Amino acid sequence: IRNLKEEKIKPDDDPDKNEPVTMKLAKFLLSTADEPRPQDLHKMLEDILMELGVKPSAEKGLLGELQKLDVVGDSSCLPSGSNSSGKSTCNCLKEKGTRKCDCPRSYTDRTSNWGWDPYHEVFYFGDRFYQHLFAGNKHDLPLHVSLGPASEVDYTLCPKDFDRMLKTFREHNFHVNITGAGYDKGVDAMGDYFYFMEKNIPVAIPLNKRRAKNLKDGNLNLSSNAIPLCKAGKEMRRHYFKKEQMSHVYCCPIKRGSRKNGEFRYVTHREECPLDTLCEPDATLAPTVQVCTKDNPRFYPVIPRGSKRYKKLAKERTGTERSNSFKKWAYSFDKAQLKSRAHRLIRLHLLAVIEHRKAMFKEETRGLSKDKIVQLALKNMEIN
């Protein structure tokens, strides 16, 4: 018996307000990283996905180089199949003739609650699932799936799911080296950047538009992509990254390298300067600015926003949308009318296994005729 009207609260996506929560969660996950997974339903389903999906796909080369693995993640809303209005437990209808009262009501789905769907801009009753996957080799292959209440947001769902994924890999002796991770602005929180920095995993995360204007870092003005601005207000040019110090060096945006007659030199494009002047005419690259990732991993991530590496991960992140669509619409998740979180979690993992199996079958039948494909399908089904 609950009063869900009181639970209808639109989540605040302001990174500053969420920073204490995400930092606390990040420190907790880091401190418990070596602990085993709890013996629960989720662990059983993770093991099934690993043995029937992830490992076979890796053996067939569908996950690419495991020592240079890029992952992407995203969440999606999952409405409950139960009645969001619940069942009345009071006598307001008989005594007052009121159908829509504010009294607590009884709900079939005890674990679901109200959450905000930012895409459709509506409240919904149910859960929110998060998944990490590999989007490459023309396939979108889930690596891990988790499920939380609808009221939970990506700020916390993402690091939780990533932590469970790493633990699952470790307990299955699945040795991978994650070299990059791509997310959307829902993970733009200082605690999440801190978590991935401590894990030594470069991330590609766009800045939340709510705070992407008039950015400042001390006396340094920044663009909407958190790139230092010169005196003329132009984004400075990233010169190089000092890996040992985890710092980026930016230089004058109108002084760029050029090659002429086989000789490399720096050329000053004075006509591009809004101030029509040179701040330091005698210098090859100056003025220069050096910013450190450790000082502010949100403003200065290892993967700069707008770089080729960033754009590659952003493009791969669209694979999560295709995978989410496959689970929810291709297999009509809503028509299943599942009324418990456990049933929804089971279905999500079985669909994830199907995604792997479809990719493997597609690779096995590439270039085959229709007759041979049918024969192979019958053989796999053990039908004579």
List the predicted regions and their residue ranges:
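Extended accessory and catalytic-adjacent subdomains in large enzymes
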Residues: 137-140, 144-146, 193-194, 201, ...
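An internal, acidic/charged active-site-proximal segment
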Residues: 153-261, 304
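Basic, amphipathic alpha-helical segments enriched in Lys/Arg and hydrophobic/aromatic residues
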Residues: 310-384
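Short hydrophobic/aromatic segments of transmembrane alpha-helices and their interfaces
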Residues: 61-62, 307-308, 342
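Long, low-complexity, polar/charged, intrinsically disordered or flexibly structured peripheral segments
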Residues: 92, 99-103, 115, 251-306
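Short amphipathic alpha-helical "interface-anchor" segments enriched in bulky aromatics
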Residues: 219-250, 297-339
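Polybasic low-complexity intrinsically disordered regions
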Residues: 6-198, 206-208
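Non-catalytic DNA-binding core/recognition domains of DNA-processing enzymes
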Residues: 1-5
